[in-house]
Design a protein with these regions (language model features):
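Inter-Walker segment of RecA-like/P-loop motor cores
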Residues: 4-58
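Catalytic P-loop NTPase motifs of RecA-like helicase/translocase cores
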Residues: 33, 67-69, 95-96
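Walker B catalytic acidic pair
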Residues: 63-64, 90
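Conserved helicase motor core of P-loop NTPases
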Residues: 93-181
């Protein structure tokens, strides 16, 4: 069907990734809501798009919702017209918001909304050490140490200086293909 769809994410990098993956223009939530630079007394943002000037679209899809705090969510919800479909995409085990709230986790745990949990991992191979250990850590289990792994490293260091030195070595020598300098 012909629906007007808006795509957004909390960060410019995530919005760019959506655009590249879908071929449709995505933008930051702040840009979509037209942030005007102000902040309300309660700590929320001031947006040009709000209850008095809502987004005129059929569907809003927001990715990386685990990074959305309660103030940004409030601004978004105020700008949604009745009848607009709002779809949140995210992983509760990914980065949380810098601001207050654990919005995505709370939405999922509320039991009020329809939730679709995806089980296929696309960024790593199914049997990768990253995937295996991430699942173990999420379950509160000890991760698997494999000294031959090229993906998952555990390097305990006793002080800040040692951590910084090891990080420098990792970025410059062991993982140069993973870092954008």
């Amino acid at each position: 069907q012909d629906k007007d769809i808006m795509l957004a994410a909390p960060t410019g990098r995530a919005a760019k990734r959506i655009t590249e993956a879908t071929g449709y223009k995505a933008q930051t939530i702040h840009r979509m809501l037209e942030l005007n630079g102000g902040v309300d007394i309660e700590g929320g943002y001031r947006f040009e798009r709000n209850a008095m000037n809502p987004l005129e679209t059929d569907v809003v899809i927001v990715d990386e919702v685990s990074m959305v705090d309660i103030h940004l969510l409030n601004g978004l919800l105020l700008a949604i017209m009745p009848g607009t479909h709002l779809i949140f995409v995210g992983d509760v085990n990914q980065l949380p918001s810098v601001g207050p709230g654990n919005v995505l986790k709370d939405i999922i745990n509320s039991g009020v909304f329809t939730v679709c949990k995806l089980s296929k991992i696309f960024r790593q191979e199914d049997g990768s050490d990253i995937v295996i250990n991430a699942h173990k850590i999420n379950k509160g289990e000890h991760f698997i140490m494999n000294n031959k792994s090229k993906e998952f490293f555990y390097m305990p260091r006793m002080n800040t200086k040692a951590v910084i030195e090891e990080l420098g070595l990792l970025l410059s020598k062991k993982l140069p293909g993973y870092v954008e300098a």
